[in-house]
């Protein structure tokens, strides 16, 4: 979910931390690169074990992940750049929160170098214990999230939800149908977004969004996948009981996704191009119920 400058000068998404955009002349081509930190994070329980011994103390993650909120959520220090390390500080008592305490990001270009995130549900085939996901969109009775962020950080970064949809129940690797993003805030340079169909203002469950969408290239998944972005009006730093189900149903009504696809999980995090030290998630929760 990296923002990249397209040839037109607009900023477009680079979907998923396992990918990087490389340019050849004036043409842009997506190429899959190794995402060691991400794949290690998907291992989940094994990676978390050492850090879990200090559950009631302040913990620091550097290129690793850990459970928070008991085992309900997973925090991943995902860094896919090549510059100095990045570390996250976890709060005591296992709260669902983290702070970027060390950031070596310094990319002056258009590719983000890191995506520290918190996860509920499934991502790249690994699921947080006890999660109700994956579920078909049509099977969701409710899906809401509360996310509070702290954004007093210098540099170039953004903050958003990342919802992946797959044609089958569990995507063992990259989800193959759609990525629905809900953006809260970002630094100005990487906030200009316009898909081929333009941007429209929509209202979903009483909230105003700016909606844009397009289909990705085919270099990563056969046939590509749909990219749908809902950007919250007013660039808030926090949302309470955000209705994720309503956003997905709105996208389905517009024929951008299918109600038969499976929601894999809910991720929320910050992409960081430069700086970012001090960015924080101070509160996070997801509640999902299914239809009987």
Predicted features along the sequence, with ranges:
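Residues within well-ordered beta-strands of beta-sheet-rich folds
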Residues: 162-164, 181-183, 210, 248-250, ...
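Extracellular-facing segments of soluble proteins and assemblies that are Gly/Ser/Thr-biased and enriched
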Residues: 114-199
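Short, hydrophobic/proline-enriched secondary-structure or compact coil segments at domain edges
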Residues: 96-100, 141-147, 161-163, 262-272
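Short helix-loop boundary/capping segments
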Residues: 168-243
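Long, compositionally biased interface segments
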Residues: 226-228, 232-292
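Short, surface-exposed beta-strand/loop "edge" segments at domain boundaries and coil↔beta transitions
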Residues: 104-115, 152-156, 170-173, 238-239, ...
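Solvent-exposed N-terminal domain segments of exported/luminal and surface proteins
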Residues: 51-107
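Secretory targeting and sorting signals
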Residues: 3-49
């Amino acid at each position: 979910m990296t923002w990249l400058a397209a040839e037109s000068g607009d900023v477009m998404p680079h979907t998923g931390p396992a990918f990087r955009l490389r340019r050849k002349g004036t043409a842009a081509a997506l190429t899959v690169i190794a995402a060691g930190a991400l794949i290690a994070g998907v291992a989940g329980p094994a990676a978390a074990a050492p850090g879990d011994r200090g559950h009631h103390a302040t913990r620091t993650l550097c290129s690793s992940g850990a459970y928070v909120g008991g085992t309900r959520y997973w925090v991943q220090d995902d860094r896919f750049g090549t510059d100095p390390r990045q570390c996250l500080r976890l709060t005591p008592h296992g709260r669902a929160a983290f702070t970027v305490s060390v950031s070596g990001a310094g990319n002056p270009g258009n590719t983000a170098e890191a995506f520290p995130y918190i996860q509920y549900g499934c991502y790249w085939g690994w699921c947080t214990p006890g999660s109700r996901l994956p579920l078909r969109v049509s099977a969701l009775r409710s899906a809401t999230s509360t996310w509070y962020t702290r954004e007093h950080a210098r540099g170039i970064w953004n903050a958003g939800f990342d919802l992946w949809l797959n044609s089958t129940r569990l995507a063992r690797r990259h989800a193959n149908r759609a990525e629905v993003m809900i953006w809260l805030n970002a630094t100005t340079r990487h906030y200009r977004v316009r898909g081929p169909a333009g941007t429209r203002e929509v209202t979903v469950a009483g909230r105003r969004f700016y909606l844009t969408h397009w289909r990705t290239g085919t270099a990563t998944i056969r046939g590509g996948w749909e990219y749908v972005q809902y950007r919250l009006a007013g660039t808030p730093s926090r949302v309470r009981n955000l209705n994720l189900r309503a956003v997905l149903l709105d996208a389905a009504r517009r024929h951008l996704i299918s109600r038969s696809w499976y929601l894999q999980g809910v991720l929320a995090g910050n992409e960081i191009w430069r700086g970012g030290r001090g960015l924080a998630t101070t509160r996070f929760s997801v509640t999902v119920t299914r239809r009987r």
